C-alpha cells in the first residue's frame, strides 16, 4: 500500500473488536434524516474530491459514476453537469427528494419491480438515477457497471460485520480500468462507537488488496468542535485511490 507524504501521524488501532458488533438498522438511518441528524452531509461538497478531481476523472468524458449511500451529496450534480452519468443508492426517500429539490432538478419516480417497496428516482435530464432501497438488495437489479465509484460516507457507515459483503458488491459493479475513490476516518475507536466507523489501513488492504492497487492520496485533520461530543480528541480523514491490478 503506497502512502502519501504527510505531516499527520495517525495512530493505527489494529484491534477494532470494540466496534465489530455495532449495528445500526435501516430504520435508524431513516430516522436520522427525519430528525435532521445529518452532520455527515457537506453542503459545499467534499474538498478533497475537488482537489483530486483530475486524478479521479483522468480527463475522461461521459463516465458512469456510482455513489453508494449517496444521501443528497451535491457532488452528484457536479458530475452530471460535466456530462457524466450518475447512479446512487440511498435508503432514505427523504434524502433523495431533498437532493432533487435543493438542486432545482425535476424528476420522476417509478417502482423497482425486483425489490418490493423500492423506487428509483430519475432526473428529467436522464443522467441522474437514484435508487431508494437497501444497498444489499441492489444486486437484484441490473444497474450496469461503472467507471468510477466515489465512496465517501459509505464504507464508514456500513455496519462493520457487513464490510466484506459491501466490498464484494462494490467491486462487482466496476468496469475494466475503474478508479475508486475512498474516504475513511481515523480516530480512537475505544472512545466513540460509530458511525462513522473507524476503518484502519489493514482493513482496507484486507478488503481491497487482492484486486486493487491502493494508494493513499492525502490525510487531513478534520476535527471540529462537534466531534468533542463524540468523546474523541482527534479525527483524520484519509483519501485512497483504488485502481485495477
Swiss-Prot record:
EC top class named in words: transferase
Annotated positions binding substrate: 40
Signal peptide limits: none
Binding site for S-adenosyl-L-methionine: 29-40, 69, 90, 152
Biological processes annotated in GO: methylation
Keyword Oxidoreductase attached: no
UniProt EC number: 2.1.1.67
One function term, GO molecular function aspect: thiopurine S-methyltransferase activity
GO-annotated cellular components: cytoplasm
Subunit structure: Monomer.
Protein name: Thiopurine S-methyltransferase
Classification lineage: Eukaryota, Metazoa, Chordata, Craniata, Vertebrata
Gene designation: TPMT
Amino acid at each position: 500500500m503506497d502512502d502519501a507524504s504527510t505531516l499527520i501521524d495517525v495512530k493505527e488501532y489494529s484491534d477494532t473488536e470494540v466496534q465489530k458488533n455495532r449495528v445500526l438498522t435501516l430504520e435508524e438511518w431513516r430516522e436520522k434524516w427525519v430528525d435532521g441528524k445529518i452532520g455527515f452531509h457537506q453542503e459545499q461538497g467534499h474538498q478533497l474530491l475537488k482537489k483530486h478531481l483530475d486524478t479521479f476523472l483522468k480527463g475522461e468524458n461521459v463516465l458512469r459514476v456510482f455513489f453508494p449511500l449517496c444521501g443528497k451529496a451535491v457532488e452528484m450534480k457536479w458530475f452530471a453537469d460535466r456530462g457524466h452519468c450518475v447512479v446512487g443508492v440511498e435508503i432514505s426517500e427523504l434524502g433523495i427528494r431533498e437532493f432533487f429539490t435543493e438542486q432545482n432538478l425535476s424528476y420522476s419516480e417509478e417502482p423497482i419491480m425486483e425489490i418490493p417497496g423500492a423506487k428509483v428516482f430519475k432526473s428529467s435530464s436522464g443522467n441522474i438515477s437514484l435508487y431508494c432501497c437497501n444497498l444489499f438488495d441492489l444486486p437484484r437489479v441490473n444497474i450496469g457497471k461503472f467507471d468510477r465509484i466515489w465512496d465517501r460516507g459509505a464504507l464508514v457507515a456500513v455496519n462493520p460485520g457487513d464490510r466484506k459483503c459491501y466490498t464484494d458488491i462494490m467491486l462487482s459493479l466496476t468496469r475494466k480500468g475503474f478508479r475508486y475513490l475512498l474516504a475513511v476516518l481515523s480516530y480512537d475507536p475505544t472512545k466513540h462507537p460509530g458511525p462513522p466507523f473507524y476503518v484502519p489501513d489493514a482493513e482496507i488492504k484486507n478488503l481491497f488488496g487482492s484486486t486493487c492497487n491502493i494508494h493513499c492520496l492525502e490525510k487531513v485533520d478534520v476535527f471540529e468542535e462537534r466531534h468533542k461530543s463524540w468523546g474523541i480528541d482527534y479525527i483524520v480523514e484519509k483519501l485512497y485511490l483504488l485502481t485495477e491490478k
